[in-house]
Design a protein with these regions (language model features):
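Conserved acidic catalytic loop of the alpha/beta-hydrolase fold
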Residues: 13-31
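Conserved hydrolase catalytic core segment
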Residues: 28-68
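Flexible "cap/lid" loop of the alpha/beta hydrolase fold
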Residues: 56-86
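Alpha/beta-hydrolase
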Residues: 74-78, 82-137
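Conserved alpha/beta-hydrolase "acid-adjacent" motif
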Residues: 155-161
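Catalytic active-site module of serine/aspartate enzymes centered on a nucleophile-bearing elbow/loop
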Residues: 171-203
Length: 203
């Protein structure tokens, strides 16, 4: 919401900004919880700052590929001209067939106008980063445990990509749901228990 972008806005620079925040707050180590596009940043943080990371929790998240792609989308997200309150509100009836989300989700996205820079940053920088810089995401080198959630009917983040990526995570617990979509609706209690068990096991 109109906060400054750190440097060129790459996941590495965003992770660096989170370290500065933790330093300011006097927090040494954290569990990282990331959803959707935020997965790239959390994974980057865990790789770059293992000494600051207790564990990684990925929730219907973007996932690293298993091999360097020959081509990838340079821009993965809504075009900039649609990133405003009016356009998104008009499109909200299409949220269910396109994204698997209720049209009422629009109210939690408002104000879209103030989020535009972040949406465009995700689409142009964050979302393509694990493909664009495949060699920099040495997932096999992660030194922390990982908990991954995903629903098979997620229309925004590929469940198949998650299944393929699992073998790259050295210490991984995977929780799969038949339904729930990108927001994992209806599985709140199961997710809460899995997260609590994960934290208690590794604390």
């Amino acid at each position: 919401l109109e906060s400054d972008v750190s440097g060129d806005g790459t996941p590495a620079k965003q992770a660096e900004a989170y370290v500065e925040l933790l330093d300011k707050l006097g927090i040494d180590k954290v569990y990282l919880l990331a959803t959707s596009a935020g997965g790239s940043i959390a994974i980057r943080f865990a790789l770059d700052y293992p000494e600051r990371t207790r564990g990684l929790i990925l929730y219907c998240s973007a996932m690293p590929l298993v091999e360097k792609p020959k081509k990838y989308a340079e821009y993965a997200g809504p075009p900039a001209f649609l990133c405003n309150n009016y356009a998104m509100f008009l499109l909200s009836p299409m949220f269910e067939p396109i994204m698997g989300m209720e049209p009422s989700t629009i109210y939690s996205m408002m104000p879209v106008n103030d989020r535009k820079d972040g949406v465009v940053l995700d689409a142009s920088i964050t979302n393509p980063d694990m493909a664009r810089n495949f060699e920099d995401y040495l997932i096999e080198d992660l030194q922390i445990p990982t908990l991954i959630f995903h629903a098979k009917d997620d229309k925004l983040a590929s469940y198949n990509d998650t299944e393929r990526a699992l073998s790259r995570f050295p210490d991984c617990t995977f929780v799969s749901f038949e339904n729930g979509g990108h927001l994992m609706e209806g599985h709140g209690e199961e997710i809460k228990k899995a997260v609590c068990d994960f934290v208690m096991k590794h604390d």
